[in-house]
Each structure stands twice: as C-alpha cells, then as structure tokens.
From Swiss-Prot:
BP-aspect Gene Ontology terms: proline transport
Similarity annotation: Belongs to the sodium:solute symporter (SSF) (TC 2.A.21) family.
Listed CDD domains: SLC5sbd_PutP
GO molecular function, a single term: L-proline transmembrane transporter activity
InterPro entries recorded: Na/Glc_symporter_sf, Na/Pro_symporter, Na/solute_symporter, Sodium:Solute_Symporter
Keyword annotations of the record: Amino-acid transport, Cell membrane, Ion transport, Membrane, Sodium, Sodium transport, Symport, Transmembrane, Transmembrane helix, Transport
Protein name: Sodium/proline symporter
Record's subcellular location: Cell membrane
Length: 511
C-alpha cells in the first residue's frame, strides 16, 4: 500500500531516467541564466525590468507562473481531494482578479511608470506619482516588500527541499540547497530577462503537466464514468456549496482583490514593450490560468478514485500530484512532471528574489548613495542588485533551514498583507487625481496593520462568531480604501503637474 505524504523513494524505485529529466531541466535553466547574463548591458533598468523590452507571450506566462507557484500543482489538487468542488470558489476569485488586473491596472501602470521618472519598482512609482521628495512612502513600502518577500521566498525553498525529500528520499537540506543554487544562479547572473524567460519555459511545463495528469488518470480509470464512481465514494465532494457559507464564498472570492497589489505580478506589466501589447498578454495569460486551474481541479477529483482504487493511504493530500505522476507515467515522463512542480516553485522564488533585490537597490541603496550622477553608477547599482539577490536568498535559506510553523502561517497571509497595503493605493494612484501623500501613507499602513491585527487577535475569535473568520484581506482592503480617501480629502491637494501626469497617462492609454 502506498502512503500519501511519505517519501516516495521508499515506495517507488526511482528510475535513472527520472533523474536525467530533472538534470536536463536544471541545465536548461542554467543556460537561460547564462544567456541573460550575456545580454546584460550593465544598466539597472535592464537588470531589474529587462529594459522594458519583454514581449506579450513571455509577459503572460511569466506572470502566471510566478503567481500560481506550487499552489496550483500541489495545494489546489490536495484541497479538491480533501474538501471537494467547494474549493473552486477561490479559483473563480483568482481568475476574475487576474482578468480585471489586466484591464484596470496593467495599461496605466505600464505607461505611468515610464513617464513619471522611469520607475522600476512599485515604491519608486508611488514616490514619483505623489512627488514625495522626503521618500517616506518609498521607504515604508520598500520595507514592507523586503520583510514580507524575504519570508515569502523562504516558503518556496522549504517546498523545494520537501519535494526532493518526498520524491527521492534526499536529505531535506540537500534538496533545499540544490533548488537554492540553481535559482540563485540564473537570477543573480541573468536578472529580469533570465527570470522572465525561465518563467515562460516553466509556465509551459506547468500547463502541459496540468493537462496530462487528469486526462491520463481518466483513461487509466473508468473514463467519464469515473465521476460517477467519485459520486459513490465521496458524494459531498461534487457539491459546490459543501461546507461553505455566504461569508466563506465571499472570502474565497476576495482573493482576487490581492492581484492589484502583488509586486512580483504587476512588475510584469511594467516590463512589457508597450501597453498596446497587453491585450495579447491578457488573452494568453488568462487562458493559461483557466486551463491550469481546471487541470488542478481535475487532478484532485480523479485522485479520489485513483487513491481508492490503488489502496493508497492518505496522510498528506498535497502530495497527490507527485504520487499520481510517478505511478501513472513512464519514469522519463514522471521526471518531467516532477520538473513541473520544481518549475512552479522556482518561478515564484526567482520573481520574489528579484523584486526584493530591486527594492533594496532602488529604494534603499540609491537613497543612501545619493542620486548625483546616478547614470554614471549603473554598473555599481547592478552589482548591488546582484549582491542583494544573494543576501535575500541567504536570509531566506537560513529561515528555511529549520522550518517554523509560525513563520509559515505568516507567509500564508502575505497575499492579504500586500493586497490590503498596496491594492487600494495602486488603484487610487492610477485613477484618482485627489490622492495625497498623507492619504497614501495612512491608507497603506492602515491596510497592513489591520491584516496583522485581524490574523493575530480577531481571527481566533471565529470559534465564537463565524464573522471573525473572514479572510483578512476584506477588512484590510476596506479600511485602507476609507483611510486613504478620508485623509486625502483632509490634506493639501497635489500639485498641478502631478494631475497633468495622470491626464497624460489617460490620453496615451486611449490612443
């Protein structure tokens, strides 16, 4: 009998072809990293944003791959397997959020970040948009990014280490270091261009995997009658409303609000060649996301019948994809599918490393170094950017060396933290002419604080009243919106040229 959640190497003989496939995958990543390094010009914007020269298809898949992470391949199938189709509500919320993001945020952000000081980070954009000469908003938002993304990144290293431990019986720390060395190499040397190309490559692998596994599982089981079998085994798992409430569904939908403020996702919009290419990126990106999420749901559902038929003991449902990929397929294909999991994990790690590095370099080092003759110090800034990648990675690896549940729980709420702190501010910055520095700073801080307070002290009260169990992005987002508006109305309006920039952006986007 197989057991979900224990080392597969103890249950399935690892074939040399599986290892070959993983090694080939790593070699391809290293080659892409070297290519990115060869293309480098020594310019910070080029290292951090690819010189704003990225095409629509790489933009689309790199955004999707860095967004979905291992959650799409491991988390969602495990959730569907355990709780059923009620997990679909979060996928609807995420897809709607991503779709709206392409329409509402992407075009204006791409144009605005270039015409207003050529901002290469989100904090830099806030600073330029609000004419914050004291750099207060830049420092606060940069600090939020550095702290939360360092913690966020460590969870990816933990996932990578556990994958090698589970699939190959390798020591956790050895697996962690293997993932770290590869991802640091291509991010350190290749910068944004290498990260974007590898994310595109990894996005393709992830999509193929999410289509292959549920289809082959259906063919190996009982075809479409498998769903009838599932209904017999776990009838409640096909119920969209099982175990949910109106508040629960709203909470799941609200995940979509976070998209407008996720730095590692919206930076993709800043790097595309032209805002006119965004419709192409949107069509591919949302299609990729929809197919991938449907595939993940398919893995979870077919897994119910598969696990039962094969008499596999379930301890950790999130290893469902790993088990199915290794039992259903030839070792060579199984290795490819394990590479898909690594792709999901590493694409997010690299994106978060680069965003954090960008913030350390652009939002802190350049402030300390001074802006005088900045153009003559580009190679120095690129070097600092590379060293920042290494520094953040070392800190994240150190935290991941001894996984701590408390930290992992905090990382699980980082989406809400970024969404509450940055989403309202991004929307206000792009659409509201009366936004002021004081309003922006107050709303951003209030959103982040509400999320932390809700997680720490209010959410535990859900045992008394279900209302307190709502997803923390909802109160955080609402408070941030209100505080930003009220404080902006009570403080001095921005200068005319700030409003002129906003009008200029509107005009360019409409062209």
């Amino acid at each position: 009998m197989f057991t979900l959640g224990t080392a597969l190497s103890n249950q399935i003989d690892a074939n040399w072809q599986t290892y070959v496939m993983i090694i080939v995958y790593f070699i391809i990543l290293l080659i892409i990293g070297f290519y990115g390094y060869r293309q480098a010009t020594g310019n910070l914007s080029e290292f951090m944003l690819g010189g704003r020269s990225i095409g629509p298809y790489i933009t689309a898949l790199s955004a999707g791959a860095s967004d979905m992470s291992g959650w799409m391949i491991m988390g969602l199938p495990g959730s569907v397997y355990s709780t059923g189709l009620s997990a679909i509500w979060i996928t609807i919320g995420l897809t709607l959020g991503a779709y709206i993001n392409y329409f509402v945020v992407a075009p204006r952000l791409r144009v605005f970040t270039e015409i207003a000081g050529d901002a290469i980070t989100l904090p830099d954009f806030f600073k330029n948009r609000l004419d914050d000469k004291k750099n207060i908003i830049k420092i606060i938002s940069g600090l939020i990014i550095v702290v939360f993304f360092t913690l966020y990144t460590h969870s990816g290293f933990v996932s990578g280490g556990k994958l090698f431990e589970s699939a190959f019986g390798l020591n956790y720390h050895a697996g962690l270091l293997i993932v770290a060395i590869i991802v640091i190499f291509y991010t350190f040397f290749g910068g944004y261009l290498a990260v974007s190309i590898t994310d595109f490559f990894q996005g393709v692998i992830m999509l193929i995997a999410m289509v292959m596994v549920p289809i082959v599982a259906l063919l190996k089981l009982n075809g479409w009658d498998t769903f009838h079998d599932i209904a017999q085994m776990k009838p409640t798992n096909l119920d969209l409303f099982r175990g949910t409430t109106v508040l629960g569904i709203v909470s799941l939908f609200s995940w979509g609000l976070g998209y407008f403020g996720q730095p590692h996702i919206i930076v993709r919009f800043m790097s595309i060649k032209s805002h006119k290419l965004l419709p192409k990126a949107r069509r591919l990106g949302i299609s990729w996301m929809a197919v991938g999420l449907l595939g993940a749901i398919g893995v979870g559902l077919t897994g119910i019948s598969f696990i039962s038929e094969r008499h596999i003991k379930s301890e950790d449902p999130e290893t469902l994809f790993i088990v199915m990929s290794q039992i259903l397929f030839h070792p060579l294909v199984g290795g490819f599918l394990l590479a898909a999991i690594l792709a999901a994990i590493m694409s997010t790690i690299s994106s978060q490393l680069l965003v954090t590095s960008s913030s350390l370099t652009e939002d802190f080092y350049k402030l300390i170094r001074g802006s005088d003759k900045a153009s003559s110090h580009q190679k120095e800034f690129v070097l600092i950017g590379r060293l920042s990648v290494l520094l953040v990675a070392i800190v994240a690896i150190t935290i991941a060396w001894h996984p701590n549940d408390t930290i992992l729980n905090l990382v699980g709420n980082a989406w809400a933290g970024f969404g509450a702190a940055f989403s309202p501010l991004v929307l206000y910055s792009l659409y509201w002419k009366d936004l002021t520095r004081a309003g922006a700073i107050s709303g951003m801080v209030a959103g982040a604080v509400v999320v932390i307070v809700w997680i720490s002290w209010i959410k535990p009260l859900a045992t008394i009243n279900a209302f307190f169990g709502m997803y923390e992005i909802i109160p955080g987002f609402i408070i941030s919106v209100l505080i930003t508006y009220i404080v902006s109305k009570l403080t001095k309006k921005p200068d005319d040229y700030v409003i002129e920039n906003l009008n200029k952006v509107k005009h360019i986007v409409k062209e």
